[in-house]
């Protein structure tokens, strides 16, 4: 699940993480029921700090027939694109996954504050704990979520993990 840098734009992308996020979104919609999502107009936001990841996530959603009835309810943007907006459910793809523990502009905590405060009911964060734990903020966030029993380990060799926090349950 390692990240890659786009040559032409210098943006970062983690395709496996994006694919995992899309799968988690589909499972989440199935769990609360497609009918309920449509009837109650439950809206979803997908946030990533990197444009390359945003473009890839958009292409995955667009190509997946499952999401066709929900496309108007799903917004995918960078952190800056979500400023001032909220959604019922937010999924965040942090992208960074490398052995050096480099997190780039994820270290800008103002941006992270924007990302993690956009959810009205549920927040799901997908990221590589071993990379992110090099930074004190992410280490504390991970520990907090772990104490709440909301960390889901995916069990692959890079220890990529999905962390989930609930504001309210849907």
Model-identified regions with their sequence ranges:
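Conserved helicase/translocase motor-coupling segment
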Residues: 1-59
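Alpha-helical structural signal in soluble globular domains
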Residues: 56-67, 144
